[in-house]
Amino acid sequence: MSAEMTDLNFAEGRPLMTDKEDGITVLLQEYVTQEHDIETAHGIVHVTMCGTPKLNRPVILTYHDIGLNHKTCFNSLFNFEDMHEISQHFSVCHVDAPGQQEGAASFPAGYMYPSMDQLAEMLPGVVQQLGLRTVMGLGIGAGAYILTRFALNHPSMVEGLVLININPCAEGWMDWAATKISGWTNALPDMVISHLFSKDEVHSNPELVETYRQHILHDINQNNVQHFVKSYNSRRDLEIERPIPGTNAVTLKCPALLVVGDSSPAVDAVVECNSKLDPTKTTLLKMSDCGGFPQVIQPAKLAEAFKYFVQGMGYMPAASMTRLMRSRTGSAASSSSQDGNRSRSHTNEGSRSRSHTGDGNRSRAHTGDGNRSRSHTDTNNINSDQNSPKSMEVSC
């Protein structure tokens, strides 16, 4: 196996920390960005490593959605001021799906693009060749699926997952038919747009939608995008299931934060995914006034939620929380907890579970009657529902 590397040095344009008492400005160290083309058993994958990995912390590993690359998907989030604090504590490894990076050449005729399972199996090679100990995944759409498959197959490599717009299910036959039609060049941008944005967003935020449409048309290799789209739409069901004591269920072993906008085209899929995961390790965050691009539309809320999540993993205990106020959430209660107390939020404070809302009220389930959040599982009787752990649901 070989890796090609290009070093690019850049410094922050302004100081991010200031010691006001001494009048001394503490500048962040210059970050070194290294681009690698890493050869794996399933082909070459392009990665961009930002910062130097720390031995006692995981590396944030990102994976983008179809029609995007790591820059168009995550730059708006990582360039946001509140994310700089996280960038100081963690190195970041951006993974571009094969052929999706800027300036990628078209695949030759007859090229067999990796399946979604094979894309996930490229990641252990990336982790090993870069000398990373463990990672914390941040993925959206197709990237969220790939990271989840990676975590299911290699749980020892993944400490946590932040999954935006995750769909754990295989595509239906209608979507399969749409994939066939997407072979026509003119249909591909529309198909990708319908995946990224809801109908409401297309009408309410036409400038943003048009920006990404132009990116798909002019800034990324459409032939390569088509391969990635077909691979995603041919994905298998992840077959995850909510664990039951005494059984060996297929589920994530690490903490997971599921994120979705309340008008996202993926909202139903994310709720279904939440219903299949371990409620003691999973938090569902629904963002109001947000569609399929929370990292672009609501970067402040997403950055704040990210901080809470990494605090729950034991990192950044002194991180500043300035954008959102926390409030109690009734959905965090767990009648089956060993200590009998209410379940805690994913922080090191030991305080009662809080949602990331600004009104300070208890978080309500997303139902019309405003009752407490229910676990999204099918139950055979009322008693089993009452005795099962409740998933934490948060609105912001």
UniProtKB/Swiss-Prot annotation:
Residues 378-390 have a biased composition (Polar residues). Residues 327-340 have a biased composition (Low complexity). InterPro entries: AB_hydrolase_fold, NDRG. Pfam families: Ndr. GO terms for cellular component: cytoplasm. The keyword Transferase does not apply. It comes from the Eukaryota. Keywords: Developmental protein, Repeat. Disulfide bonds: none annotated. GO terms for biological process: pronephros development; signal transduction. Residues 326-396 are annotated as: Disordered. Sequence repeats lie at residues 340-349, 350-359, 360-369, 370-379. Residues 340-379 are annotated as: 4 X 10 AA tandem repeats of G-[NS]-R-S-R-[AS]-H-T-[DGN]-[DET]. Residues 346-377 have a biased composition (Basic and acidic residues). Transmembrane segments: none annotated. Belongs to the NDRG family. May be involved in pronephros development, after specification of the pronephros. This is Protein NDRG1-A. It comes from Xenopus laevis.
